[in-house]
Swiss-Prot record:
UniProt remark on cofactor binding: Binds 2 magnesium or manganese ions per subunit.
Catalytic activity: 2 D-alanine + ATP = D-alanyl-D-alanine + ADP + phosphate + H(+)
Function: Cell wall formation.
Cofactor: Mg(2+); Mn(2+)
UniProt-listed GO biological process terms: cell wall organization; peptidoglycan biosynthetic process; regulation of cell shape
Binding positions (ATP): 126-181
Presence of keyword Cell wall biogenesis/degradation: yes
Enzyme class: ligase
Subcellular location: Cytoplasm
EC code(s) of this entry: 6.3.2.4
Signal peptide: none
Domain of life: Bacteria
Protein name (database record): D-alanine--D-alanine ligase
Length: 297
């Protein structure tokens, strides 16, 4: 089977995507698959470059990767691909819509507002919500242009930074707690990881992708809490109609999990969370890639 590794792209996460793509190429079973590296530099590239492949392994991140657009292209071209449907991808990429769905399903998530311009900032509401808050692009990823703000005077500058990356900006109540993530592969929860950033105060871009940027360890909580985290993660999987593989990021405060977001195309670099979680149940990187392909077909 000829597998195209789709990487690069046009988003701010291009570098991360290229690293994911290289890792996938290095670890994919070359005895089982014919691997075709496909670097996307502009949107039209996809039509020409993917013509002869049997399966698209999407290693893109951000816009034109995780937002459902390239998934729609592959569906139109009758090419099976890794991960979620266009609809699920688009909804999960939009943090505001995702949080509205989480809220409607009684899944804990931090309080938030979403703004479309600087003039939209409701300082009175933010005062009631309470500081600190997190300011970030509504449809961004990899914590690009994400800032923790302690006081109202600094909101505008952080919002302007985030508006460089998206047309909408989310301002979310900052919950101080332990960062955890639950990776789900084909509807099965893998070991939970706890994330301890060594660089920066939260799991930002540097923590995620720099060597030594963070420490991620498999954790097992007491049974009731462990079950609760897994149950919430699987509820998210069902709620958003996920497929293939997804990562559910959370903050744990006073033994209460708050869902931050769902990642429908989790990073697959050597520093990424998904391979580390899979390794916790003795699934090698090569086996993980094979399982992703099989459950996405």
């Amino acid at each position: 089977m000829k597998v195209g590794i789709i990487m690069g792209g046009i988003s701010s996460e291009r570098e991360v995507s290229l690293n994911s793509g290289k890792s996938i190429i290095n670890y994919m079973d070359k005895n089982k698959y014919e691997i075709v590296p496909i670097v996307i530099d502009k949107k039209n590239d996809v039509f020409e470059k993917v013509k002869d492949i049997d399966f698209a392994f999407i290693a893109l991140h951000g816009k034109f990767g995780e937002d459902g657009i390239i998934q729609s292209v592959f569906q139109t071209m009758d090419i099976p691909y890794s991960g979620c449907s266009p609809l699920t991808s688009g909804i999960c990429m939009d943090k505001d819509i995702s949080k509205k769905l989480l809220y409607s399903a009684n899944i804990n998530t931090a309080e938030w507002i979403c703004i479309k311009s600087i003039e939209n900032i409701d300082y009175d509401y933010l005062e009631k919500m309470g500081y600190p808050v997190v300011v970030k692009p509504n449809s961004g990823g990899s914590s690009v242009a994400t800032t923790i703000i302690e006081k109202s005077e600094d909101i505008e500058e952080a919002a302007r930074l985030a508006f460089n990356y998206d047309e909408e900006v989310m301002i979310e109540k900052y919950i101080e707690g332990d960062e955890i993530t639950c990776c789900i592969l084909d509807g099965t929860a893998l070991p939970i990881l706890a994330i301890k950033p060594n660089k920066g105060s939260f799991f930002d871009y540097t923590s995620k992708y720099a060597d030594g940027g963070s420490e991620e360890i498999v954790v097992e909580f007491e049974k009731p809490l462990q079950s609760k985290i897994e149950e919430i993660s699987l509820k998210c999987w069902e709620l958003f109609k996920c497929k293939g593989y997804v990562r559910v990021d959370m903050i744990l405060k006073d033994k209460v999990p708050y869902v931050l977001e769902l990642n429908t195309l989790p990073g697959l670099t050597k520093n990424s969370l998904f391979p580390k979680s899979a390794n916790g149940v003795n699934i090698s990187f090569t086996e993980l890639l094979d399982k992703i392909i099989q459950c996405s077909m």
